[in-house]
Amino acid sequence: MEHYDWNDGWLFCPTFDPALVRPECTGLELEPVRIPHTVKALPYNYCNENDHQRLCGYRREFFAPAEWAGRTVLLTFGAIAHDATVFCNGRRLFHHGCGYTAFTVDLTSALHLGKKNVLAVRCDSRENLNIPPFGGSIDYLTYGGIYRGVSLDIKEPAYLRDVFVEARAEGDFRIYTATVGETVGCTLQAEIRSPAGSRAVYRGELALPITGTLNGVHPWSIEHPTLYTLTVKLIRPGTSGLPDRVLDEKTVRFGFRTVQFVAGGLYLNGQRVVLRGINRHQSYAYQGYAMPDSLQRLDAQFIKKDLGCNAVRTSHYPQSPAFLDACDELGLLVFTEMPGWQHVGDEAWKAQALQNCREMVCQCRNHPSVFLWGARVNGSPDDEAFYKRTNEAIHRLDPTRPTAGAHIRRREQLLEDVYAYNDYSYRGRGPACEARASVTPDTRKGYLISEFGGQNFPAKPFDDEAHRLVQALHFAAVLNDSIAQQGVAGSFGWCLADYNTHREFGSGDRICYHGVMDLFRNPKLSAAVYASQKTPRAPSDIVLEVSSAMALGDLPGGVPGACWVFTNAESVRLYRGNDFVAEFAPDRRGRFAALPHPPIEINDFVGSLLEKYEGMDHASALQVAAILNELRRDAMEPSPLSRARMLSLRLGWNDVLRMYYKYIGVLGSPAAEYRFEAVWHGRAVRTVVREPVQSVRLECVVHNPILTDGPTWDCAAVSLRAIDQNGNLLPYCGEAVQLRTEGPVKILGPAVVPLRGGMGGTYLATTGEAGRAVLHCRMEGALDTEAYLTIRCRE
């Protein structure tokens, strides 16, 4: 058994030419590329979706040693978008019609042993293909290329094709195997290794699953994602005194856990879980789908650790095994679904969709994080015969998990186990999600909200303060109401990050600004809605995000706007200068009472100041403060109650105006300094200061500064932010940042990038060499900044 990574040494041709499959390929301009690869890098926005739609080709020459005689040579592609035909030495060997699943090609019969061989791939990423997700309009780009890793395996003629383990929380397990080749007389050996290193060995026959019970298991859960390792060996017993021979072995990670969906919600290992999830597209700026494993894993980190989500939906297709691996390790539940978007095609299209379902299940079913299969094309109309087949195919291959399918209409046919509903009903008032009983045709089955939020109310990072706040409160309202409504298992917000799209969608610049993060995964204000729901275990876990910059000139008429704080602290203290104003606690009976940590509205900017500076008694100060805060809220329009208070306190309008100018402020008033303190366990653990900007600094953060070149090229994700002297984002800074590198990395995308909403980013790819690298960043009006990286090469 030999394994080789095959991600270097490829040649790319932007148009497919039959000469690519021939032994000699002269006259073609071929570009050396490394995998993962995209057929066309696109600009950040205003891209042309036709640019990545092309019929192109890849070629790789290799030597096949004579020692491979009598062996089986298997070539595996992690994913090729979207229609791939593989040739070896001129022979057409394999065709694959899904851009989101892996496939394996047996090269054995076509090889020239002891000689040079030529492998060629015909890659078709045109959207007129009669395969999912194509056939209708699509609200995302689908890109093209060999965008996941490639590997070569040399095996015996008899080998293990697949291993699947069912493992329940109680410790019961069943191990299924599938083999290829002559296996008469062969046996199986299965070894389960715990995280602590203890081992249990079981033996079995090929015709039956290996069953058993492992005592004292630690179930996989969101809080404790315990992973076990299973190694299965295919053994040919020795004869005539010869020892047994291991023909093949396969290792998978898995977890002991039990998933149950009922009318009351989701139960994991018998404990109810309220899903607080997000939808994720696997696309990135410039590169589309073609990013290495490290960035796939980084997205899982953002979702679980930064946003505090416990679930993710891989909209609208199966995603990278590296992403699923990270979800397994982090305890992040995954709802993965068959490729497609609102369209169901003809019988040939459906046949490919069924095959996609089978491949999705077989390739993802050992991941304990996967708890739900999407057996329906997102948003598609009813098709009873077709969706009976998808559900049957999935349950046949994996009887342990329920199925769902994202519906966009009420009371559609429910052939799945769970009714998943894209609920975009909220318009800013009233209930934020529809009543479960009015949507699902069968209230005895499970129910969840598969999408909500960003599509209904997109927000650009550079939108004004009020717009960004409305999006954040929109997310908070639906999150709250999905928790409050009995029988709703939870929700998946739309979506993690902004993404490139077709001309029929988005904001006219080929971007859907639906994300709680931008394309570079910089957080918007709405990200704080999710992040603030985390349960803090240390001061560093405390989130404190203030919605307002407290800049009156940014607001219509200079009238102060709403100010909300998104925090998981116990309370928030407000100071004006050095003077304490008031302390605010979450409203456990208000609009967001169902949330673990409701956002806090800062509605008192006067507080105790009147007692200190106006000499008022406490009761009078409370009434006057109420008048001033109401005037702030209502654009200087006193209510009848405020007028009555003024009369009872013998306050004239000029008296009120004087105090308003002094304690609230108007356009042109001396700018005040506000300090917000997050209080946890009785002490201030995090502070935000709002005051006029005195200096601008360019912040450069490399999220993964240690890179490993191998088995593919690696990539660093870099975030850029313009911040003030207090570390606050400057949302209207749009300066250009000049980027320059030293060392063995290269910039993906332009070397000069603008900040959008005060934020930006870039990617740094390894070049096949080890060493230290430096990223130099220069922006007008700020000091230059640098970031350092370490690049290692895997042997």
Put a short name on every predicted segment.
Residues 1-43, 122, 472, 476-479, ...:
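Accessory carbohydrate-binding/adhesion or oligomerization-edge regions at the termini
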Residues 112-116, 181-260:
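Extended acidic/polar, glycine-enriched regions
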Residues 175-178, 232-234, 563-567, 714-731, ...:
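Beta-strand-rich structural segments
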Residues 186-189, 223-227, 560, 568, ...:
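Short flexible loop/turn segments that cap and initiate beta-strands
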